[in-house]
């Protein structure tokens, strides 16, 4: 049975070897490009221009399909937007796990580089599935008149407060705690679940993605509260999982965040 090499026994040359550098460069490039896209497209994505952005547009011949949130064009644009946001928001907090995997993986440099990319792709595959769900939810909310296409923020303070309160409750569940613990200890996670080869990298990437999803899905849905394309709100929500994952477990950052979310829900109802 193969054993996982201990990171502290690896020479500096291996820690700075090509697979680690390539993984780090790929992560950095993906994060920078995703954030660059968000900054280059700061206006709300309302599907080829919504009725609120151009008065009278909905009355023009042929524009009905363009304004339909269930049209293929709109759903594809919404999915792409959510997928890019998940890359920008979730890859930074996953970077320690991904780089650790690249460091301790065995095999030739080509095999380690391949395994690192498989790990990243499978991790992102989980968030891609979430992005599909989020895009469909967005279309349903717009179609139901609950999410204005020009802001992509919930119109109802009651509904927004309910979503924030639900996220606070999830923070207090044992499932959230279990998922967060897996994300807070990259070394323990890799040592427990690491398997050699491409298949091992695929399983590890999917497993980490699922734990990360269980930890952060409710926070990501809060994008509907402050605005799906509100850059300040996106940055704030991206910071929350990062803080949860890098702070010591004894600090119970998830519990503090639950309290803040409950206060936020109350504020939405009060004001």
State what each model feature region is.
Residues 20-32, 147-173, 253-271:
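Selective transmembrane alpha-helices of multi-pass membrane proteins
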Residues 2-83, 107-108, 146-152, 174-195:
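Histidine-/acidic- and/or cysteine-rich, low-complexity loops and terminal segments associated
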Residues 95-105, 172-176, 240-249:
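C-terminal ends of transmembrane helices
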Residues 23, 27, 74-78, 115, ...:
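Residue-level signature of transmembrane alpha-helical entry/exit and packing/kink sites
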Residues 128-143, 147, 158-185:
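Transmembrane alpha-helix/helix-exit interface in multi-pass inner-membrane proteins
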Residues 110-140, 215-250, 256-263:
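A small-residue-rich subset of transmembrane alpha-helices
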Residues 3, 9-13, 78-124:
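Juxtamembrane transmembrane-helix termini in multi-pass membrane transport proteins
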Residues 168-178, 200-228:
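Alpha-helical transmembrane segments of helical membrane proteins, especially in multi-pass transport
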């Amino acid at each position: 049975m193969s054993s996982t090499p201990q990171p502290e026994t690896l020479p500096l040359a291996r820690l700075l070897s090509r697979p680690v550098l390539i993984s780090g460069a790929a992560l950095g490039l993906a994060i920078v490009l995703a954030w660059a896209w968000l900054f280059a497209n700061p206006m709300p994505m309302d599907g080829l221009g919504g009725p609120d952005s151009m008065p009278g547009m909905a009355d023009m011949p042929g524009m009905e399909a363009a304004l339909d949130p269930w049209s293929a064009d709109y759903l594809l644009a919404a999915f792409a937007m959510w997928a890019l946001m998940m890359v920008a928001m979730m890859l930074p907090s996953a970077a320690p796990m991904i780089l650790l995997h690249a460091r301790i993986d065995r095999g030739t440099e080509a095999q380690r580089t391949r395994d690192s990319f498989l790990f990243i792709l499978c991790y992102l595959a989980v968030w891609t599935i979430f992005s599909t769900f989020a895009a469909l939810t967005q279309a349903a909310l717009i179609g139901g008149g609950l999410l204005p296409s020009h802001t992509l923020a919930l119109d109802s303070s009651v509904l927004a407060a309910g979503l924030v309160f639900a996220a606070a409750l999830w923070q207090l569940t044992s499932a959230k705690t279990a998922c967060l613990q897996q994300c807070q200890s990259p070394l323990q996670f890799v040592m427990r679940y690491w398997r050699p080869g491409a298949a091992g990298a695929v399983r590890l990437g999917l497993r980490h993605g699922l734990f990360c999803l269980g930890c952060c899905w409710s926070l990501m849905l809060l994008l509907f509260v402050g605005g799906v394309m509100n850059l300040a709100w996106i940055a704030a929500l991206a910071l929350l999982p990062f803080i949860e994952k890098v702070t010591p477990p004894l600090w119970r950052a998830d519990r503090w965040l639950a309290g803040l979310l409950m206060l936020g829900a109350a504020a939405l109802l009060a004001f």
